[in-house]
Amino acid sequence: MLQPTLTSWVILAGGQASRMGGKDKGLIALNNKPLIEYVIDRLTPQTSNILINANRNQDDYQQYGPVFGDHFQNFPGPMGGIHAGLLHASTDWVGFVPCDCPRINEDLVERFCRAVTDETDILVAHDGDHQQPVFTLYHKRVLPKLTAFLERGDRKIILLYKECHTQYVDFSDSPDCFVNLNTPEELTQFGQLES
C-alpha cells in the first residue's frame, strides 16, 4: 500500500463559482464556518501535506496552507487546478478534493492509497453510479499528458482517462462524501439539515 505520508492533497478552490453568484465557494460560510474549513477538518487527520489551489482571494486562503493559482489563465476548470497541483506538490502522488464538499470521508486518503498499483496513473472515486472526477489521485508522470491535453484545449476529462492507466476507487458505501454545495439554495438547505 502507498503510504499516505507519500502523498500531497490539493483542495480545489480555483473555480469561478458561477452558480454561486461568483462568490468564492471555499470562503462562503456554512453555519458560520467557511466551506474550506470543513474540508480541512476532514483531511488534516489523514495527511499533513495539504495545499490549496485558488485563483482569487489567495491572501484569505493562505491562513489554511500553501496557496497557488492555475498556470493556464483561461479557467480550464478543475483540470487547471489539477495541472497546477501536479506542478507544485513535492510528492509523486497528488490527490485532489473540491472545496465545497463538507462530508469528505474520514478514510478517503487511505482508500486511495490502498488502491494504487504499479501501473496506476490516475485513481478516481466512484460512488456506485457515477465517477467523481474531482475526488482523485494522480501520479506526477501524468503531467506531460495533462499539459498537452490542456494546450490542445481539451476539457473532457474522460479523454485524459483514456490516455492514462486509470482505475476507480469504490465509495459506493458512502455517497454522502460527494455532497457538494453549488448554489445558495443548496447551501441554505444543507445548513438547515446540519443544524
UniProtKB/Swiss-Prot annotation:
Listed GO biological process terms: bis(molybdopterin guanine dinucleotide)molybdenum biosynthetic process
UniProt-annotated binding residues for GTP: L12, A13, G14, K25, N53, D70, D100
Cofactor(s) in the UniProt record: Mg(2+)
Catalytic activity: Mo-molybdopterin + GTP + H(+) = Mo-molybdopterin guanine dinucleotide + diphosphate
InterPro entries with a match to the protein in the record: MobA-like_NTP_Trfase, Molybde_CF_guanTrfase, Nucleotide-diphossugar_trans
Assigned EC number: 2.7.7.77
Key word Cytoplasm present: yes
Locations listed in the record: Cytoplasm
Keyword annotations: Cytoplasm, GTP-binding, Magnesium, Metal-binding, Molybdenum cofactor biosynthesis, Nucleotide-binding, Transferase
GO molecular function, one term: molybdenum cofactor guanylyltransferase activity
Taxonomy, superkingdom: Bacteria
Gene3D superfamilies according to UniProt: Spore Coat Polysaccharide Biosynthesis Protein SpsA, Chain A
Amino acids binding Mg(2+): D100
GO cellular component: cytoplasm
Quaternary structure, from the entry: Monomer.
Function, in words: Transfers a GMP moiety from GTP to Mo-molybdopterin (Mo-MPT) cofactor (Moco or molybdenum cofactor) to form Mo-molybdopterin guanine dinucleotide (Mo-MGD) cofactor.
Family: Belongs to the MobA family.
Family annotation (NCBIfam families): molyb_mobA
Domain comment, as recorded: The N-terminal domain determines nucleotide recognition and specific binding, while the C-terminal domain determines the specific binding to the target protein.
PANTHER family assigned: MOLYBDENUM COFACTOR GUANYLYLTRANSFERASE
Protein name: Molybdenum cofactor guanylyltransferase
Organism, as annotated: Vibrio vulnificus (strain YJ016)
Taxonomic lineage: Bacteria, Pseudomonadati, Pseudomonadota, Gammaproteobacteria, Vibrionales
